[in-house]
């Protein structure tokens, strides 16, 4: 006769151990060793000892959380933001900026198997010129939440301040909250974006139901009183301009217009320095033909055109190609052309590529540029600058160039997002003669 037993829940006792942290990974986690295994502990810094509880134990590594910190690193800082540790935006406000830059540079050097030549950085606070804040109506309290997502969660942290935002945007937070919280449609708001352009401040409101005339009037009054350009987005395809003209920002002596939803680099200071250094590394000469792949609306393309004989910008998004052409006209640049192409196909067969290029710049998305590396090699440029927002795909794509006879001449860590785990970089490849 079969006997049945009630299942017993498997219990695991979290092991408490004492560790010494000897490194910081690029995500801001302390790194220690225990029983021959690497242990990652958020919140700890090198030279700190702590009692920690193991939360995840894998074959090659383990994760733990701090139970009690026993000592403090000389590079520990008091976080400026009251939401740090709960908000998912920043991971490293407890570490000095110098330590953050060293740990990211070390991670980049390991991946690229090459020393980092320099760190390109700007101000570590008040650098973000764009932010998207989630909105959520709470029926019980009839209040509107406005903020960023919690780390590893879809819950919203109700943000009152954010010291990495441009000061103009941070100062707007309580005013925007009060305005949106007074709308009849606050149950039907998705998110609000704030953008600080050279031309002024933008507010883009995503709403999921039609706005009443009273709500529209409130928003218009608010935009006028705060000097904002106001845009309404009833869905992902439609953008209604309520007030303001085409926004623009300055970049290396040029004026670049953009649509409120277009991608622009969040850190204006690092962007300026990055573009200037890219031009310097390419050593652009008056007779050069230069190719800019994944060119967007011309962030690199147009500055390149001020120095080269001709520049071709290639982009996969038609609207950005159109914006690049418009920006070339606005800046009086007649030696630059933009093309919409599928960059997974062989662009070297296009008529505009028949004369080849002396220099190439590429700035792909996180997926990298595996599909175009062989095309670049076929063009035989003397110098290549690769701008990357993902060091793993950069390392992968670099292998093709190294095998084709190029060498890494310069490697820079771009501190585009201080206090976060984001690591951006730029590499100069030179062809071996």
Curated annotation (Swiss-Prot):
Active-site residues, record numbering mapped to chain: 389 (nucleophile)
Annotated catalysed reactions: uridine(1939) in 23S rRNA + S-adenosyl-L-methionine = 5-methyluridine(1939) in 23S rRNA + S-adenosyl-L-homocysteine + H(+)
Pfam entry (one): tRNA_U5-meth_tr
EC top class named in words: transferase
Amino-acid positions noted as binding S-adenosyl-L-methionine in the UniProt annotation, renumbered to this chain: 265, 294, 299, 315, 342, 363
GO BP terms, alphabetized: rRNA base methylation
Transmembrane stretches, start-end: none
Binding-site list for [4Fe-4S] cluster: 81, 87, 90, 162
InterPro entries (alphabetical): 23S_rRNA_MeTrfase_RlmD, MeTrfase_TrmA_AS, MeTrfase_TrmA_CS, NA-bd_OB-fold, SAM-dependent_MTases_sf, TRAM_dom, U5_MeTrfase_fam
GO-annotated molecular function: 4 iron, 4 sulfur cluster binding; iron ion binding; RNA binding; rRNA (uridine-C5-)-methyltransferase activity
Keyword set includes Cell inner membrane: no
Source superkingdom: Bacteria
EC number: 2.1.1.190
Keywords recorded for this protein, A-Z: 4Fe-4S, Iron, Iron-sulfur, Metal-binding, Methyltransferase, rRNA processing, S-adenosyl-L-methionine, Transferase
The keyword 4Fe-4S is annotated on this UniProt entry: yes
UniProt-listed SUPFAM superfamilies: Nucleic acid-binding proteins, S-adenosyl-L-methionine-dependent methyltransferases
Domain TRAM: from-to ranges: 10-68
Gene3D superfamilies to which the protein is assigned, alphabetical: 2.40.50.1070, Nucleic acid-binding proteins (2.40.50.140), Vaccinia Virus protein VP39 (3.40.50.150)
Function: Catalyzes the formation of 5-methyl-uridine at position 1939 (m5U1939) in 23S rRNA.
UniProt-listed HAMAP family: 23SrRNA_methyltr_RlmD
UniProt family annotation: Belongs to the class I-like SAM-binding methyltransferase superfamily. RNA M5U methyltransferase family. RlmD subfamily.
Protein name per UniProt: 23S rRNA (uracil(1939)-C(5))-methyltransferase RlmD
């Amino acid at each position: 006769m079969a006997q049945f037993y009630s299942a017993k829940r498997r219990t695991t006792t979290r092991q408490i151990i004492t560790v010494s942290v000897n490194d910081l990974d690029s995500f801001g986690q302390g790194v220690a060793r225990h029983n021959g295994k690497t242990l990652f502990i958020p919140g700890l810094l090198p030279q700190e000892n702590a009692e920690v509880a193991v939360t995840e134990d894998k074959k090659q590594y383990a994760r733990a959380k701090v139970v009690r910190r026993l000592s403090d690193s000389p590079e520990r800082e008091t976080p400026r933001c009251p939401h740090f540790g709960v908000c998912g935006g920043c991971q490293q406000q407890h570490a000095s900026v110098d330590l953050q830059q060293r740990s990211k540079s070390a991670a980049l050097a390991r991946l690229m198997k090459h020393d980092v030549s320099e760190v390109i950085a700007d101000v570590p606070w008040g650098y973000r010129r764009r932010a998207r804040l989630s909105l959520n109506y709470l029926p019980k309290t009839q209040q509107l939440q406005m903020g960023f997502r919690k780390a590893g969660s879809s819950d919203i942290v109700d943000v009152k301040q954010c010291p990495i935002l441009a000061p103009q945007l941070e100062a707007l937070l309580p005013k925007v909250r009060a305005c949106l919280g007074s709308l009849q449609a606050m149950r039907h708001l998705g998110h609000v974006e704030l953008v600080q352009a050279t031309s002024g401040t933008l507010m883009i409101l995503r709403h999921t139901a039609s706005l009443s005339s009273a709500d529209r009037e409130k928003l218009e009054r608010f935009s006028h009183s705060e000097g904002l350009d106001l845009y309404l987005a009833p869905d992902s395809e439609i953008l209604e301009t309520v007030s303001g003209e085409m926004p623009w920002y300055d970049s290396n002596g040029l004026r670049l217009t953009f649509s409120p939803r277009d991608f622009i680099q969040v850190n204006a200071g690092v962007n300026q320095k990055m573009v200037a250094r890219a031009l310097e590394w390419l050593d652009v000469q008056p007779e050069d033909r230069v190719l800019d792949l994944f060119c967007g609306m011309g962030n690199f393309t147009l500055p390149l055109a001020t120095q080269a004989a001709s520049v071709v910008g290639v982009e996969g998004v038609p609207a950005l190609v159109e914006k690049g052409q418009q920006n070339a006209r606005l800046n009086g640049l007649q030696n630059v052309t933009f093309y919409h192409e599928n960059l997974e196909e062989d662009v070297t067969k296009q008529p505009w590529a028949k004369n080849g290029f002396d220099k190439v710049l590429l700035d792909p998305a996180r997926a990298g540029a595996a599909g175009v590396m062989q095309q670049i090699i076929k063009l035989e440029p003397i110098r290549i600058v690769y701008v990357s927002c993902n060091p793993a795909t950069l390392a992968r794509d670099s292998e093709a160039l190294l095998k084709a006879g190029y060498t890494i001449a310069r490697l820079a860590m771009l501190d585009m997002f201080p206090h976060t785990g984001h690591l951006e970089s730029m590499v100069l490849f030179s062809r071996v003669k």
